[in-house]
């Protein structure tokens, strides 16, 4: 009887272990989760779609929470790969995070299509956002109070824009919005608004103006002549290896095979 009970116990433990192993090797092992920058939506969405098409049974997810949230998510183990539209800060690197530049993206300065202004210098943009220039007539436009639209604190797009224009902690925003899409929609609906957004996400509902005579485009970002640009970064942990599926995705998106997909999505591949 004791031998029988012992055998039953061993079988029960074995069954439990098998169930656990199956759970670990099931859907979670065949999935890739990303979290972060809303500016990277078009690029990462296209890459995820291509990866799923080439790998039957694999699930790819993207959570558009913003760069700061995506960095926190990977640091806390809540996703496989974080997405940031800015370089990591020293304190983030000190947490054991590492970054890989996936692509480069222009930050387009956008206005309503009805606005006659088509070019501003970097200095004028800084003066507008810090409240030194408040009316469009001061920069060759129609008479109208300038409405400043920007992103929320923690946004990689905001960090890049303010760093390049030298306006950190000095912008006089009317609205601070939580996504690239919201900025574009708001500027499209207000003739006096100005905003900034990922070049890869800009639609014909707004007008991307030139900066210092240089229009934002893939070619001007690539040759460096367009002044307001930043990296699209993949964030991972140094001390935690990716799952086989997540590593396969990482290798795919950073390979030469992904360059055309990234380009078609409006960014400039880093490799």
Q: Which residue ranges define each predicted feature?
A:
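C-terminal motif of bacterial Sec signal peptides marking the signal peptidase cleavage site
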Residues: 19-23
């Amino acid at each position: 009887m004791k031998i029988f009970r012992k055998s039953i116990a061993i079988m029960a433990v074995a069954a439990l272990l098998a169930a656990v192993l199956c759970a670990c090797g099931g859907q979670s092992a065949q999935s890739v989760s990303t979290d972060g920058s809303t500016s990277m939506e078009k690029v990462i969405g296209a890459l995820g779609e291509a990866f799923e098409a080439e790998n039957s049974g694999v699930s790819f997810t993207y959570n558009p929470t913003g760069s700061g949230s995506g960095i926190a998510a990977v640091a806390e183990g809540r996703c496989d790969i974080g997405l940031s539209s800015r370089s990591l800060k020293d304190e983030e690197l000190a947490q054991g995070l590492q970054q890989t530049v996936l692509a480069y993206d222009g930050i387009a300065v956008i206005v309503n299509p009805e606005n006659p202004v088509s070019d501003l210098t970097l200095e004028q943009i800084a003066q507008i956002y810090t409240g030194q220039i408040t009316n469009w007539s001061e920069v060759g436009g129609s008479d109208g109070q300038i409405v400043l639209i920007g992103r929320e604190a923690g946004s990689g797009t905001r960090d890049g824009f303010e760093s390049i224009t030298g306006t950190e902690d000095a912008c006089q925003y009317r609205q601070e919005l939580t996504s690239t899409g919201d900025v574009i929609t708001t500027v499209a609906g207000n003739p006096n608004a100005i905003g900034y957004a990922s070049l890869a996400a800009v639609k014909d509902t707004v007008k991307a103006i030139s900066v210092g005579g240089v229009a934002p485009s893939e070619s001007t970002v690539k040759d460096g002549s367009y002044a307001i640009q930043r990296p699209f970064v993949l964030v991972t942990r140094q001390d935690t290896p990716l799952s086989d599926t997540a590593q396969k995705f990482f290798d795919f998106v950073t390979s030469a095979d992904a360059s055309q997909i990234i380009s078609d999505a409006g960014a400039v591949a880093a490799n």
